[in-house]
Structures are given as structure tokens and as C-alpha cells.
């Protein structure tokens, strides 16, 4: 994902570790998916809960494994921004990064989404739409490359990834903490809204970005055929 921070354009003396660091962050994002999914599974299987009291009379229950999984995912999100930012800042964008950076995003995001669905944290219909969209879109990208078509990425796809990350973090941290009084209707509505709204937004951005990309490919092919 493209970093929102400005990249200075000044002469640089690049050290070896600076050339390698963005790629190592990409590799880290792939491998951190495994312990993240494991901790989500441990929470589902063991249900380790720590309870503590705040403000004198409010009891909070913390699902430890789910919380740790959320923290690990945050490190993946941070690495996603930093590898792109540093690669452009130091002008060390590599073919490895171009290939593996988007794949690393798919591994960590789709892997965690599958785990959350398997453990019942949100409905599988969201996952089906998102995964099918990615598969078809990857096929279209491969077709475009084979035909030497230049199809620029659109901002909707970046928003899709952003909302997917927000949705995962909401699932991990909202479900990690629960008050003792969680049976009230208002509390249930709040939990449902804050967890599910990001998934709806991520799904909407997925469909819109897919439609835009497919339309761009169709128009490009049409123009090329006329030529």
C-alpha cells in the first residue's frame, strides 16, 4: 500500500541495509501471518480470559490470545506502510518489492480473514466476495500483462485494503474487550455496528474497484483493437 507521507527528492548515499530493509519488511509481513492466525485459533480453542476492574466497579474481560493476534496484525500494518515509504524515500524500489509487496498484503489479510470466518467472528459472505474479487482481478491483471496493456491502479482498491485492515483490527480488539454488562440491547447493537460496518465498507470498495479495473481493461482492449 502506498504510504501517505511525502517522499523527499534529494541526492542520497544508500547503504546496504537500506536497500534490503523494505524487502525484509515485506518478508516479515508474510511470516507474521502464521503466528497471528495461531493466536486467533488459540483464543477460539482455549478462550484464555483475563479479568480486571477499573473505575472501582467496572469489570473488563480481556481475551488474551485474540488481543495478541491483533497486536501482531498491527505490526504487519505498520510494516506495510514503512516498506513502501522507505523504498521510495531511499529510491530502492526493487522488482522483488513490486512482486511480493501486494502478495504479502494478500497473505496476511486474506489469511487472517479466513481465520476470523472459521472462528465465527464475522459472516463468510464478506470473505467470499473479497476473495473471489481478488482471484478474478489477479486473472485480469495477468491477462493485461500478457497483452502488454497498461492499466493503472485506482484509489478504490487502496481504500479497500485500508478498510479490510480496519475491519480486522476492529474484530480483534472489540472482541478482545468486553464489559461485564454485555447483554443489554444497546451494547449488542454497538458491538455489531462497530465490527460489521468496516466489513461492509471493505466489500463495497472491493466491488467498486473491481468494476473500475474491469472497465479500464475493456476500454483499453477496445482502443487497441481499433488501432
UniProtKB/Swiss-Prot annotation:
GO biological process: phosphatidylglycerol biosynthetic process
Domain of life: Bacteria
Class in the EC hierarchy, top level: transferase
Reaction catalyzed: a CDP-1,2-diacyl-sn-glycerol + sn-glycerol 3-phosphate = a 1,2-diacyl-sn-glycero-3-phospho-(1'-sn-glycero-3'-phosphate) + CMP + H(+)
EC number(s) given by UniProt: 2.7.8.5
Compartments in which it is found: Cell membrane
GO cellular component: plasma membrane
Major subcellular location class: membrane
Membrane topology, as annotated: Multi-pass membrane protein
Membrane-crossing residue ranges in chain numbering: 30-50, 58-78, 112-132, 159-179, 192-212
Pfam families, per database record: CDP-OH_P_transf
Keyword Nucleotide-binding included in the entry's annotation: no
GO MF assignments: CDP-diacylglycerol-glycerol-3-phosphate 3-phosphatidyltransferase activity
Gene3D superfamilies: 1.20.120.1760
Pathway: Phospholipid metabolism; phosphatidylglycerol biosynthesis; phosphatidylglycerol from CDP-diacylglycerol: step 1/2
Keywords, in A-Z order: Cell membrane, Lipid biosynthesis, Lipid metabolism, Membrane, Phospholipid biosynthesis, Phospholipid metabolism, Transferase, Transmembrane, Transmembrane helix
Keyword Ribosomal protein among record annotations: no
Protein purpose: This protein catalyzes the committed step to the synthesis of the acidic phospholipids.
Family: Belongs to the CDP-alcohol phosphatidyltransferase class-I family.
Name assigned to this protein: CDP-diacylglycerol--glycerol-3-phosphate 3-phosphatidyltransferase
Gene this protein is translated from: pgsA
Amino acid at each position: 500500500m502506498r504510504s501517505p507521507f511525502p517522499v523527499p527528492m534529494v541526492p542520497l548515499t544508500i547503504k546496504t541495509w537500506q536497500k534490503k530493509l523494505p524487502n525484509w519488511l515485506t518478508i516479515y509481513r508474510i511470516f507474521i501471518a502464521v503466528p497471528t492466525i495461531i493466536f486467533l485459533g488459540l483464543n477460539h480453542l482455549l478462550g484464555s480470559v483475563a479479568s480486571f476492574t477499573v473505575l472501582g466497579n467496572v469489570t473488563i474481560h480481556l481475551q488474551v490470545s485474540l488481543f495478541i493476534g491483533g497486536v501482531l496484525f498491527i505490526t504487519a500494518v505498520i510494516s506495510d506502510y514503512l516498506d513502501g515509504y522507505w523504498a521510495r524515500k531511499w529510491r530502492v524500489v526493487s522488482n522483488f518489492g513490486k512482486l511480493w509487496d501486494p502478495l504479502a498484503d494478500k497473505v496476511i489479510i486474506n489469511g487472517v480473514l479466513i481465520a476470523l470466518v472459521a472462528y465465527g467472528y464475522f459472516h463468510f459472505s464478506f470473505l467470499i466476495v473479497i476473495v473471489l474479487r481478488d482471484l478474478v482481478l489477479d486473472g485480469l491483471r495477468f491477462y493485461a500483462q500478457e497483452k502488454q496493456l497498461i492499466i493503472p491502479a485506482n484509489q478504490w482498491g487502496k481504500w479497500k485494503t485500508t478498510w479490510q485492515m480496519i475491519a480486522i483490527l476492529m474484530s480483534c480488539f472489540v472482541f478482545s474487550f468486553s464489559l461485564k454488562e454485555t447483554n443489554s440491547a444497546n451494547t449488542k447493537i454497538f458491538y455489531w455496528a462497530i465490527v460489521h460496518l468496516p466489513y461492509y465498507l471493505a466489500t463495497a470498495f472491493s466491488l467498486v474497484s473491481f468494476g473500475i479495473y474491469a472497465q479500464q481493461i475493456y476500454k483499453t482492449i477496445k482502443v487497441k483493437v481499433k488501432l
